[in-house]
């Protein structure tokens, strides 16, 4: 049995006026699925630095008031995901950012009340974030 590659990432539950930002993946194997924005931790970064950088890259926004929520461990078919999640707020507005010349990082974004989370088709690992957030 092969050992799954482990990928360590960070994700943001961005809260504004009581609603939470969900983003729709705009590329790759999970295109069209909904997720909390974030990405991989680079060597030499701590989790908070990585999350601030990723949100700046993906949404051209700055975040603050980071509060740790949960760490999710999830086995996808080709890799093991460790996702450290923080609740945070925005310092400025967000905008769409292109992943490459032709692909948007995110196809769509929506602000949701936590009662509306169940209406979206989420990436499986993000469902554990939703559960943790609803318990807060």
Regions found by a protein language model. Name each.
Residues 29-33:
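A conserved beta-turn-beta hairpin within the catalytic core of GNAT-like acetyltransferases
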Residues 36-70:
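The catalytic Nudix box helix
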Residues 1-20, 40, 71:
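Conserved N-terminal beta-strand and adjoining loop/helix that marks the start
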Residues 14-15, 22, 88, 111:
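Conserved hydrophobic "DFG−1" position in protein kinase catalytic cores
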Residues 22-24, 100:
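Beta-strand scaffold of nucleotide-dependent catalytic cores
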Residues 99-132:
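NUDIX/MutT-family hydrolases
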Residues 4, 72-97, 110-116, 133:
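Active-site-adjacent beta-strand/loop module that shapes the phosphate/pyrophosphate-binding cleft
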């Amino acid at each position: 049995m092969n050992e799954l590659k482990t990928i360590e990432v960070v994700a943001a539950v961005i809260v504004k006026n009581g609603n939470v930002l969900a983003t729709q993946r705009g590329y790759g194997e999970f295109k069209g699925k909904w997720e909390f924005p974030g990405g991989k931790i680079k060597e030499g970064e701590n989790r908070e630095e990585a999350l601030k950088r990723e949100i700046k890259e993906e949404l051209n926004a700055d975040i603050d008031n980071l509060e740790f929520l949960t760490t999710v461990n999830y086995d996808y078919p080709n890799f093991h995901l460790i996702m450290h999640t923080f609740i945070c707020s925005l310092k400025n507005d967000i905008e769409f950012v292109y992943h490459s010349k032709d692909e948007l990082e995110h196809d769509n974004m929506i602000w949701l009340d936590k009662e509306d989370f169940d209406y979206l088709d989420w990436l499986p690992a993000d469902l554990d974030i939703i559960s943790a957030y609803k318990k807060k």
